[in-house]
């Protein structure tokens, strides 16, 4: 039995488990069996089988990766993210599952050697290729299982991630599946028309369109592209007809229809008959009559409806698909040449791993989604005796969310606990004495009472300070005494079962979590966390063989109280704080925010003039190696200043002039002048984020 290839059957020794580290008995036993290469006569029925590749220190800490997953990685990681034996996070190649995972901390180290500092947005091309593959293959499998007579054509909505390296790879990876693109503006249409998509792929044009937009879409047919112009209004139809006749190019049309079903989730407003886009039932009938009158009814080949983004509930999806199918049947009865049923977006991502209908989760699998869609469409078409249409979906989030992660360092932490003992001194205020004495009387039975008393005494002492009746050093001792009580209460709570805590006690102690100050901008890199309370899994990238000993919230580097994260994905759901490790001043502590590939890059803003981060795309390879495919440097200070109408060259000239005056008026030396100007110039060239020396 050797190394990673060694497997052993573990049997339970009933008489000696109490001697082993808590939570590690099975792992420790396996270690002993491996080293001795023998099985004691005490052992009975085989119960567990697993690889033995764990380092020796792993069995001495009392905290075992295999027995404990603080962050719920096994639930939300989807096989892409896992914990390595050294306690680091590893990235697993879903295209080659037998490959050794890539150590994410090692990726950061190699990037830094190239001069690429964190924060960095890391894209993994394997993850993107795999998602496109499994979405298309899941639909094809469902079509075979149901006996559906049509086919599937997916399209990627460019708005979900417009970045060139992303769209280009989607076009490449989607080519075997005739995977197309969806656009909602002229700029996005120009992107789509430049991509090498499969000739069978669809280019679907949504959004409001002027004559130039329509002209581009019509002319693209001369390139052999299947471009469908989806009508958003009756007025738009008249413009399409006018431009089409001017060019002498017949249009290929779709119609966007508002359905009455309203779904749950953050984006429920995009569904229902009060949604912003699409035609009402009455307007659809009007459009059909206009097309009939203009002899263009055969041009109407696609019906589009949009359910919304990140729809968590499968029942709602089925109802939506049923309604869309019935409408398709009725429009076809009016004489339209409908061939494509575009069901829009909605396929969600399980950010929390809860498999629930909460906004950040989904209560269905990809396979269930595809099967339910195909089955529902097929049933309705069969019932009406209508030929099965080609099913189209615009599953942007499900394509790209998992493929990107934000990696950043923790700069420092602020703790609200004190380990130091505060002793009463002669002449101390009685309230301070009472606060200090609470530590001696603390027990598991009076935790909430003691917290109430400590808070009362501290608040009264603060009031005395405000009235000038207490000195600053005495108030500082009171604050330390209060923090010590909090620390003692938290330690006692860790030894108790959750059932022994009161909810109030838990909330109040969590509300006093540490603050970990991190090198990123929430507004630039994770805007949905600020805007709609979106959850992204956030975990340490190292030290996962150690038990976290701190509870924390995260703050970014912006000077804004909203630049904080205080809801986190953990093993048992969602928590108000994140378990983390105490910082080591001799070692960088990195965190990763996962599944950030959908919408975040373009929605990010320049709050405090923190610009785009460095962006790197890698390819996971064999033997735990990776290949650097693309690197895009983050914004420099100079670039960000130019975005807000400053001319960096002019700024430098003005600063030089001011520095010259300083030499004349304040006696600054020429050497100091030179250093000032040099520092200013270098700062203009620098990264907008905190840079390590």
What are these regions (language model features)?
Residues 12-16, 25-27, 40:
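Short, positively charged low-complexity motifs
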Residues 147-342, 347-352, 363-368, 376:
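Active-site-proximal beta-alpha core segment in soluble small-molecule metabolic enzymes
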Residues 62-117, 619, 627, 637-640, ...:
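Conserved, well-structured core domains of diverse proteins
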Residues 1-21, 50-53:
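N-terminal, intrinsically disordered charge-dense segments
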């Amino acid at each position: 039995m050797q190394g990673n290839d060694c497997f052993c059957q573990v049997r339970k020794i009933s008489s000696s488990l109490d001697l082993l580290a808590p939570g590690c008995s099975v792992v420790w036993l396996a270690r002993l069996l491996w080293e001795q290469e023998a099985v004691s006569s005490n052992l009975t029925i085989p119960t567990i089988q697993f690889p033995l590749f764990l380092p020796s220190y792993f069995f001495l800490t009392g905290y075992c990766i295999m027995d404990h997953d603080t962050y719920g990685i096994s639930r939300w990681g989807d096989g892409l993210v896992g914990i390595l034996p050294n306690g680091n996070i590893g990235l697993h190649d879903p295209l080659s599952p037998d490959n050794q995972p890539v150590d994410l901390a090692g990726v950061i180290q190699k990037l830094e050697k190239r001069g690429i500092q964190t924060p960095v947005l890391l894209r993994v091309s394997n993850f993107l290729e795999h998602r496109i593959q499994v979405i298309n293959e899941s639909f094809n499998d469902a079509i075979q299982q149901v006996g559906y007579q049509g086919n599937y054509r997916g399209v990627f909505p460019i708005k979900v991630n417009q970045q060139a390296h992303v769209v280009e790879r989607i076009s490449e990876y989607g080519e075997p599946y005739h995977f197309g693109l969806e656009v909602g503006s002229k700029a996005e249409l120009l992107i789509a028309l430049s991509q090498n998509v499969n000739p069978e792929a669809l280019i679907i044009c949504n959004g409001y369109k002027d004559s130039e937009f329509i002209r581009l879409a019509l002319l693209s047919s001369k390139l052999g592209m299947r471009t469908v112009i989806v009508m958003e209004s009756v007025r738009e139809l008249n413009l399409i007809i006018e431009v089409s006749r001017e060019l002498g190019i017949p249009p290929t049309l779709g119609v966007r229809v508002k359905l009455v079903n309203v779904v749950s989730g953050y984006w429920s407003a995009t569904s229902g008959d009060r949604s912003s886009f699409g035609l009402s039932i009455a307007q659809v009938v009007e459009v059909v009559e206009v097309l009939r009158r203009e002899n263009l009814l055969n041009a109407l080949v696609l019906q589009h409806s949009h359910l919304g983004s990140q729809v968590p509930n499968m029942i709602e999806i089925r109802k939506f698909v049923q309604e869309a199918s019935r409408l398709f049947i009725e429009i076809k009865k009016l004489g339209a040449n409908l061939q494509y049923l575009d069901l829009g977006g909605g396929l969600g991502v399980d950010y929390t791993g809860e498999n629930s209908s909460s906004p950040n989760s989904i209560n269905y699998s990809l396979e269930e989604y595809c099967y339910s869609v195909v089955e529902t469409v097929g049933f309705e078409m069969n019932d009406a005796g209508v030929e099965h249409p080609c099913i189209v979906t615009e599953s942007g989030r499900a394509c790209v969310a998992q493929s990107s992660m934000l990696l950043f360092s923790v700069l420092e932490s602020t703790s609200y606990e004190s380990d130091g003992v505060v002793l009463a001194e002669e002449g101390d205020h009685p309230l301070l004495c009472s606060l200090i004495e609470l530590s001696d009387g603390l027990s598991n039975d009076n935790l909430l009472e003691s917290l109430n008393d400590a808070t009362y005494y501290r608040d009264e002492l603060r009031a005395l300070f405000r009235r000038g009746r207490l000195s600053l050093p005495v108030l500082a001792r009171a604050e330390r005494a209060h923090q010590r009580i909090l620390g003692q209460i938290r330690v006692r709570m860790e030894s108790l079962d959750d059932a022994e805590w009161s909810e109030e006690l838990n909330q109040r102690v969590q509300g006093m979590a540490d603050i970990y100050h991190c090198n990123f901008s929430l507004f630039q890199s994770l805007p949905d966390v600020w805007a709609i309370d979106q959850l992204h899994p956030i975990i340490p990238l190292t030290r996962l063989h150690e038990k976290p000993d701190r509870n924390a919230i995260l703050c970014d580097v912006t000077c804004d109280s909203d630049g904080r994260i205080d809801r986190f994905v953990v093993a048992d759901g969602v928590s108000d704080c994140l378990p983390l490790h105490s910082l080591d001043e001799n070692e960088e502590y990195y965190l990763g925010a996962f599944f950030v590939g959908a919408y975040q890059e373009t929605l990010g803003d320049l709050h405090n003039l923190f610009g785009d981060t460095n962006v790197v795309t890698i390819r996971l390879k064999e033997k735990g190696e990776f290949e650097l495919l693309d690197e895009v440097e983050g914004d420099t200070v100079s670039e960000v200043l130019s975005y807000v109408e400053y001319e960096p060259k002019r700024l430098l000239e003005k600063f030089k002039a001011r520095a010259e005056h300083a030499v004349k008026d304040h006696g600054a030396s020429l050497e100091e002048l030179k250093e000032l100007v040099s520092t200013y110039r270098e700062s203009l060239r620098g990264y907008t984020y905190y840079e390590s020396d």
